[in-house]
């Protein structure tokens, strides 16, 4: 009886039973997808802002709020959720891959005595996992950018993808399979910048707040440090993000691409639209970052609790 009770509370060897890695990866992807449902409108507004005024044209939107109200007026409530299927697939591929790579590398680099990797090594692991996940998620990213951009174009110029799978099939058939990875370099670069900026700015912000004497090491301090970290991360990654967005949305003109590479995008944006146009869409990008992270962890915790209650207890 005692042995049975011990096995029920934990494993046969008395150790606590934990979720399999495959379940953890699955839950990570599902949690990211759940959060995306809530922040998709912010992603759409950010993408529209980054494409507004492209090529020295008159800006379609003055502010992020103007963009949101214009989209609602012209395309309705469903319009702000355009590209949701692509956003969900991006999370399913990017988040799951990133989590899987991070876990594998973390375990490989953990010492034989159980000593975890140091801060710098964890940063390298995080950036490597982020870049790999971004590469795998690039096809969904291309579909997302094009689907969210469609509504701003005249009807005869729209691509008219029905959903993310229709987009991927048509892109492959009409432009070649390599087009699915168009902009993968800036996409991977953004992931590296985001991971590096988040790690460095969060720890520094937290230490600064604690040293000020006004904060203790509690949830308020963590929240404020997260907000500062989000601000730094957004500022650092937006120029790379606008390069990614424009490359993935560009068309071929007389057989030639609108942009040669990410640097060409940055030079043209600064030349024709002004230096600060590199940060177009800053508000929705920053507003998306915090809620998406918080919601992802909330969903992840709830799924883990439910799994333990249903399959690991008793």
Swiss-Prot record:
It catalyses: (S)-malate(in) + 2-oxoglutarate(out) = (S)-malate(out) + 2-oxoglutarate(in); malonate(in) + 2-oxoglutarate(out) = malonate(out) + 2-oxoglutarate(in); succinate(in) + 2-oxoglutarate(out) = succinate(out) + 2-oxoglutarate(in); maleate(in) + 2-oxoglutarate(out) = maleate(out) + 2-oxoglutarate(in). Changing residue 239 to T: In PPGL6; loss of protein expression. GO terms for molecular function: oxoglutarate:malate antiporter activity; RNA binding; transmembrane transporter activity. It comes from the Eukaryota. Changing residue 147 to V: In PPGL6; loss of protein expression. The modification Phosphoserine is found at residue 6. It is a multi-pass membrane protein. The modification N-acetylalanine is found at residue 2. InterPro entries: Mito_Metabolite_Transporter, Mitochondrial_sb/sol_carrier, Mt_carrier_dom_sf. Signal peptide: none annotated. GO terms for cellular component: mitochondrial inner membrane; mitochondrion; nucleus; plasma membrane. Solcar repeats lie at residues 23-108, 117-208, 217-306. The modification Phosphotyrosine is found at residue 102. PANTHER family: MITOCHONDRIAL DICARBOXYLATE CARRIER-RELATED (PTHR45618). It is linked to Pheochromocytoma/paraganglioma syndrome 6: A form of pheochromocytoma/paraganglioma syndrome, a tumor predisposition syndrome characterized by the development of neuroendocrine tumors, usually in adulthood. Pheochromocytomas are catecholamine-producing tumors that arise from chromaffin cells in the adrenal medulla. Paragangliomas develop from sympathetic paraganglia in the thorax, abdomen, and pelvis, as well as from parasympathetic paraganglia in the head and neck. PPGL6 inheritance is autosomal dominant. Interacts with SMIM26. This is Mitochondrial 2-oxoglutarate/malate carrier protein. It comes from Homo sapiens. The lineage of its organism: Eukaryota, Metazoa, Chordata, Craniata, Vertebrata.
